[in-house]
Amino acid sequence: LVTKEVSYTDWESPNKTWDKVGVDVLPGYIADKKEIPAKEAATPAKDTKVIPDETDKVTYTKIGSWIPVDPTTGKDGDPIPFPNDPNDPTKTGEVTQIIPHKDGYTPKDGNGTPLEPVNPANPEEGYKPPKITDPKANIKITYDKDDQKAKVKFVSVDDEGVETPLDTKYNIDDLTGKSGDKIPEEKVQARVDVLKSMGYDVVDNPFDQDPTFDTKKEIDQEFTIKVKPQVSTAKPVYVVEGDKPSSEKLKDAVTTKGNEKTVDETKLPDTTDKVGDDTLTAPVTVTYGSGDNKREETVNVPIKVVEGYPQIVPVDPKEAPKAEDSINPDDYPAGSKFTYEKEPDTTTPGD
């Protein structure tokens, strides 16, 4: 006996047959027999009318349980005992117990078969227990990490914070793993390196925080990496009225981190009658990256049209020329000559 206790019940009969006796249901235990069957009474010994006592034994064994295993520690959790059949001490009864849900995990029986949710639309309500095949044997419930998936998209942001999605070919939609595991970053870093080669600076990268897969297998995680395009700068190019700026001067006027600069000479402006026109520009195309992974930037170089020789730089009377009034002769066409509008007084420091 499980309890190591023996109890006795009177078994009486007014005739020559012992009547059958039902076995009581003991909650939490399974009996080895449902009843004590009727049996013929033994013949009394001579010189006595007393029928000898008859003894029979019923053994109770502790009923089995479903035992959920903690997925984080691997230790057995609180057992969930099988139900007793109220009418048969040798059987288990109607199953109403529920196996608890754990976020990010799927419960499975001893054969590795996933349990059926009580409500498929809401697994958080729990799962139906595995079928009982032996009322005295425990059934372990293991929890396996769910398969998870993550996606990454890339957007370009401007100085005002406005986001523009990059070509979808740079997005990543096949990052997979298990609940709680670190999301693999190899593909993400490779994509970031490509965008850097295309002249983008990373503004915000959530993968710097080593994110992990969440516990919601029905919903893919989504991450957004923000990048900002590098911008080239240009200084003015001076040309004599009627001439066009050379490609080399235009390229030299552009400061960039790009790997190539090109000029479409068919797009160079006509400078005739354009002296003093501050809207005149010439486009220079800057290329970042190469092949299928390249970005082109159009840099509009200011074109300053000047008259023929000599060049005049006005200054205030009795002032040395100011820095902002000075010129770089290298910016002008070869052979240009320069004079002051008025001869400055170099004995008095300028402002």
Question: What do the PLM-derived regions correspond to, one by one?
Answer:
Residues 1, 28, 66-68, 104, ...:
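Extracellular/surface recognition and adhesion modules
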Residues 57-67, 141-151, 225-232, 300-310:
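Short domain-boundary/entry signatures in modular proteins, especially
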Residues 8-34, 51, 59-61, 86-102, ...:
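Extended non-catalytic domains of envelope/secretory-pathway proteins
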Residues 4-17, 68-100, 157-159, 167-191, ...:
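Solvent-exposed, low-complexity, repeat-rich "mucin-like" stalks and linkers
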Residues 18-21, 55, 63, 77, ...:
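Surface-exposed or flexible loop/turn and strand-edge residues in extracellular/cell-surface modules
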Residues 1-6, 36, 51, 58-64, ...:
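Serine/threonine-rich low-complexity intrinsically disordered regions
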Residues 79, 163-165, 294-298:
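Short linear proline/tyrosine/threonine-rich motifs used for host-factor recruitment
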Residues 34-58, 110-140, 203-222, 256-296, ...:
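Serine/threonine-rich, repeat-prone extracellular segments and beta-strand-based repeat modules
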